[in-house]
Amino acid sequence: MEHYLVAIAVTAGVYALMALGMNVIWGMAGLINLGLVGFFAVGAYASGLITLKLGAPIAVGVAAGTLLAAVVGVLVALITVRLRGDYLAIVTLGFAESLRIVMSNELWIANGTDGLSGIPGPFRAQLGPHLFNLLYLGIVVAAVVVLFFLVDRLVNSPFGRVLRAIRDDEEIARFAGKNVVVFKVKAFAFGSAALGLAGALYGHFTSYIAPDLFAPLLTLYIKLSLLTGGLGNSKGAVLGAVLVVFFLESTRFLAPLIPGLSAVQAAAARELAISVALLLILRFYAKGLLPERIEPPPLTASGAAPAASRI
């Protein structure tokens, strides 16, 4: 039971990392990215291949996965950044699905649908399953704490205020002299790096990854996390991720509680419950449990905000 609870906690931490990354892309910059699972997969596969095939240290693999996800994020952003709304969502979703199909069919990259197994974890053999899980939980929690403070500082920085200005009215931000394209690309790069970090940490914990793990449904879970916690709020992103993982795991026990419900029907009921939860959140908590709170820019000695920080 303890092993199961620790695994859930690690999963919640990974979801929190993804939610924090998406909070920058979607919550702050207003970019609708439905391909977040693609960047998650880039980080997982890059770190897994580098450590498993090349024998590189795990820290090097995680760093490489994070960096590569950021680079891919920049490339995708440069192609899609001038698109808006539904068009951006469709293109990013297409990127993630194309990546998943390629990884499924090209056996020479990562064994296709069989996936990568035996991905090393830090001191897994020396510590044994119990201590390894506790160690890894500490690593994931540390990563969440560091990323949380980075994103939280970003939210209240001049850069964060420009992103919110772009989200609220892109034309006004452009009229104020801000290079909208550059800011969008930077937001995409930062968020993609966080998604890649989450993917790398996930792969080294489970020691196995396959294309089926990176289905679009994962994107929905992270979106649900942000909507639950509150878009644009770092605390809300973490809270939403924890609540969504708790909800997903608790609904696994539906089958024994409902007489005559088969495993297949229980899985369908689980997805239905998730959909109902999303509708209820949108109905009663449109801005999330912890709505975005924008701090005013710092004042100068004259009592006015610096010109560069008014956006």
Regions found by a protein language model. Give the residues of each.
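Transmembrane alpha-helices and adjacent helix-loop boundaries
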Residues: 1-311
